[in-house]
C-alpha cells in the first residue's frame, strides 16, 4: 500500500524546486475533486503534464483509465512515480521537458490532458495544446486564477485579450473552481483556478490559429486603438475587409468577438 502523498514525497526527500515552478498538492480530497471535473472513465486515455509527487496521478489512476502517460522533467520524481507504477501497470512515465516534446508523437488517439501547470509555462503550453485540439477530448488545467479569468473572459471586459480569443476559437471553456494558496506546498502568492477546456468538434487549423495569434498580437498591443488602425500594416485593405464582414471599422480590440477574429483571419 502506498503511503500518503506527503509521506511518499518525504521518503524520497523531494522538496519543491523554484526553477521548475513546483507547488505540490498533498490534499488527496482536492486531487479527487479536480479529477472528477475531467469525467474520465475506464475507456479514457490520459496524459498528465508535470505529475511531481503524484497527487493528481493517484486520483487519475483510481478512476482506472485505459492508460495514463505522465510527463515529468524532474528526475528526482521518477523513482517515486516508478513506485506508483508498481501498483498501476497502466501508468507510463516519460522523463522529459514537455516544451521539448512533439505531442503528436505521443498521441495516437483522443486523450484527456490533466495538469497542475507551473505558472511560468502555463500560457505557452495552453496555446501549444490548443493547436493539437483534434487529438484532445478535453483538458483540465490548474493555472493562476488571473490566467483562467483571461481564458474565460467575454468581449468588452478588462480581462478579455489574446488568450481569450485564441482559446475560444478552438474550444468551449469553463472555470470550475478556485484553489486557495494554502492548498499548496509551498504556498504561492496568488490564487489558482481549475479550467475545463473542451475542443470544438471541428476546430480551426493550426495555420488559421497562427493567423489569429498574429492579428491579436497587433490589436491587443494597442487595445484602445481602432481595429482599422492596428491592422493597417498587416492588411492594407482592412477597411474593405471589415466592411465586407460587417465589422465596425471604429471598433477596438476588446469589442470584437473571437468569431470576428476568426473571420478576419480567414480573409488573410
From Swiss-Prot:
Chief localisation class: cytoplasm
Keyword annotations from UniProtKB, A to Z: Cytoplasm, Methyltransferase, RNA-binding, rRNA processing, S-adenosyl-L-methionine, Transferase
Amino-acid positions noted as binding S-adenosyl-L-methionine in the UniProt annotation, renumbered to this chain: 23, 25, 50, 72, 97, 116
Segments traversing the membrane: none
Cellular localisation: Cytoplasm
InterPro entries registered for this protein in UniProt: KsgA/Erm, rRNA_Ade_diMease-like_C, rRNA_Ade_Mease_Trfase_CS, rRNA_Ade_methylase_Trfase_N, rRNA_adenine_dimethylase, SAM-dependent_MTases_sf
Cellular component GO terms, alphabetical: cytoplasm
Annotated family: Belongs to the class I-like SAM-binding methyltransferase superfamily. rRNA adenine N(6)-methyltransferase family. RsmA subfamily.
Protein name: Ribosomal RNA small subunit methyltransferase A
Gene: rsmA
